[in-house]
From Swiss-Prot:
This is Small ribosomal subunit protein uS2. Keywords: Ribonucleoprotein, Ribosomal protein. GO terms for molecular function: structural constituent of ribosome. Pfam families: Ribosomal_S2. It comes from the Bacteria. The gene is rpsB. Residues 259-282 have a biased composition (Low complexity). Belongs to the universal ribosomal protein uS2 family. Residues 254-294 are annotated as: Disordered. CDD domains: RPS2 (cd01425). NCBIfam families: rpsB_bact. It comes from Renibacterium salmoninarum (strain ATCC 33209 / DSM 20767 / JCM 11484 / NBRC 15589 / NCIMB 2235). Residues 283-294 have a biased composition (Basic and acidic residues).
Length: 294
């Protein structure tokens, strides 16, 4: 069954690019047409690239890899945190700190500092060993660290791959990933450079619904990879009891079983070749989201 349907892409406004005056000529091959001054992305190509990225992420996680979810723009923050947490992966959704990958040892020390501050009882001044002023300063430090590093608190080494929403905004993350040869999976809007991304997904990186859908697809790929990893580990442990699953892993297994009939129903929807231009729902999305964000 397909990872996502054409109708889902249309309803989420994935096909809306930027205004024609704001584009990267390298993206020409991914553009279907132009409508009312806005480029329309070829969703047939998007479907193929989604499948390719999905299989890569799934295989990476199945072999023990980790996916770092990155998206600091307002439209992506909630989806990045929600979907990465759902599958137990690290994320950055507020600010990318320079050297987060290339200087990971220093970042790891800051994470350890954050965990040490979390052990302090800020409500009990007497037993804390600090004055009220010191506790206030330490609390501020903790709040700042949690905002910047809270999403990667359990990241013990550089990730195996990175999922990025808006490659232009997250150019620092792209640069660091390239230096370390970390594969990048990302949404490519019509103003992006496809040469910067290893596994591109042509689509709208500004509309909230588009970002939510594509980020969920990547999280689903992670979930399948985790299930495959666990199945492989269980199968290789002959004669021994299977290691208990974490609570969130059990939920993934249960949801994958219960959602299968729904997914099959969605898969039955016939793709519409020219719907990227003619669908009324898509045109409404253009008015409400694309024009405001582009």
């Amino acid at each position: 069954m397909p990872v996502v349907t054409m109708r889902q892409l249309l309803n989420s406004g994935v096909h809306f690019g930027h205004q024609t005056r704001r584009w990267n000529p390298k993206m020409k091959r991914f553009i279907l047409t132009e409508r009312n001054g806005i480029y329309i992305i070829d969703l047939q190509q998007s479907l193929s690239y989604i499948d390719r990225a999905y299989e890569f992420v799934k295989a990476t996680v199945a072999h023990g890899g980790t996916v770092l979810f990155v998206g600091t723009k307002k439209q992506a923050q909630e989806a990045i945190a929600e979907q990465s947490t759902r599958v137990g992966q690290p994320y950055v959704n507020h600010r990318w700190l320079g050297g987060m990958l290339t200087n990971f040892q220093t970042v790891a020390k800051r994470i350890q500092r954050m965990k040490e501050l979390e052990e302090i009882n800020f409500e009990d001044v007497a037993s804390s060993g600090h004055t009220k002023k010191e506790l206030l300063l330490l609390k501020r430090e903790l709040t700042k660290l949690e905002g910047n590093l809270g999403g990667i608190r359990n990241l013990n080494k550089v990730p195996s791959t990175i999922w990025i929403v808006d490659t232009k905004k997250e150019h620092l993350a792209i640069d660091e990933a390239k230096k370390l040869n970390i594969p990048v999976v990302a949404i490519l809007d019509t103003n992006c450079d496809p040469d910067e991304v290893d596994f591109p997904i042509p689509g709208n990186d500004d509309a909230i619904r588009s970002v939510n859908l594509l980020t969920r697809v990547i999280a689903d790929a992670v979930a399948e990879g985790l299930i495959a990893r666990n199945a492989k580990a269980t199968g290789s442990a002959e004669g021994t009891a299977a290691e208990p699953l974490a609570e969130w892993e059990r939920e993934l297994l249960e949801s994958s079983n219960t959602e299968a009939p729904v997914a099959e129903t969605a898969a039955a929807e016939a793709p519409v070749a020219d719907a990227a231009i003619e669908a009324p729902v898509a045109e409404e999305a253009k008015t409400t989201e694309a024009d405001d964000t582009k």
